[in-house]
Amino acid sequence: MSSIRWALVGTSDFALEWIAPALARAKGSSLAAVVSRDRSRAAAAAAQVGAAEAYASIEAIDRDLVDGVVLVTPNSAHGAGAIAALQRGLHVIVEKPMSHTVAECEQMIAAAETSGAMLAVAHCMEWAPPIVAARELLERSVIGRVHRARIGASFLAEPGSLRRDGVAPASGDAARFGALFDMGVHAIDTINRLLGPVAIVRSVRTDTGDADAVAELQLASGAAVELSSRWSADENFLEIVGTNGVLRSREWWGREFAGHLEIEQSGATEQVPLRRANVYDAQLSHLSDAASGRCAPATSARRGAVNVAVIEAVVRSARSGESAPVSAPRGRLG
């Protein structure tokens, strides 16, 4: 199969302005269709982004014309959408977070194992230039053994918004999903990827609706990490302290950017050269290759489930006031 024909599920501004163009540009990828519950909305969006087909549901997708779906839907719809697509043999890329519970992540993984189709999670900061460079430096042990780190992924929400006020309604997506599921999952995924798995967490602060969260993470390696994710401030920092130096970034996350990374050793600081990149282009090129069977997906389903497990542990810790272990999700996929 020379190119994976993707259907974009969702018609948000983010889906149409960022993901659709990236699907069209990515190597080994083509944008074949748009899916929305409103068929006329799907048709209008398809015309806007240059897709030939429009469908009102995943079940309506013509399997002769589409190989996989990219789910850019509300968090609460991720599980049902992924399982429906996998049951039809469609490859799935699901936006982060993978789901709102580990239990549903496990159901998604089971569906993928049964179908044989790819299930991957859109943890796009895997391809952020500062993270790519930091990973290479850490793999070479340039700063020695890591013993502590801190990371922030936050933004200042608009005044009057649910995010800014930090008051969750009684039901719906916003009641279940807050800053940790929004930007915090990027930080959790980055720590898991760069420094190894999180073993134990202690929630220092989680406000109502999870609008302002701070947690201490103890890694399996013994390193300690302070993580913050808020809707009350702009935060974009990463610091990794090792026995032989420090890596620092004042811009590690973004969409189309070069970012910043520097290394401090023996009292001298050197900036690491970075090239501007669109994280979605790189992500969708890689995952199209993975769907074609040319490689394993870097942002695997299991990786997505592990990140949700860390968030669940933070929530348990916030409720109990005590440290909480991170439970490994079931399933072998990824």
Residue ranges of predicted features:
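Hydrophobic residues in well-ordered beta-strands that form the structural core
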Residues: 15, 94, 119-121, 227, ...
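Predominantly a Rossmann-like dinucleotide-binding segment in NAD(P)-dependent oxidoreductases
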Residues: 125-202, 321
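C-terminal helix-rich "cap/oligomerization" subdomain common to oxidoreductases
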Residues: 1, 60, 68-70, 289-334
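N-terminal Rossmann-like dinucleotide-binding module
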Residues: 1-49
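Basic phosphate/pyrophosphate-binding loop/patch that engages nucleotide-derived ligands
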Residues: 110-118, 132-148, 222, 242
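Contiguous beta-strand/loop segments that form the cofactor/metal-binding neighborhood of enzyme cores
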Residues: 182, 188-254, 284-295, 331-334
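Active-site loop of classical SDR/Rossmann-like NAD(P)-dependent oxidoreductases
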Residues: 14, 273-285
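Beta-loop-alpha module in the N-terminal Rossmann-like domain of NAD(P)-dependent dehydrogenases
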Residues: 49-111
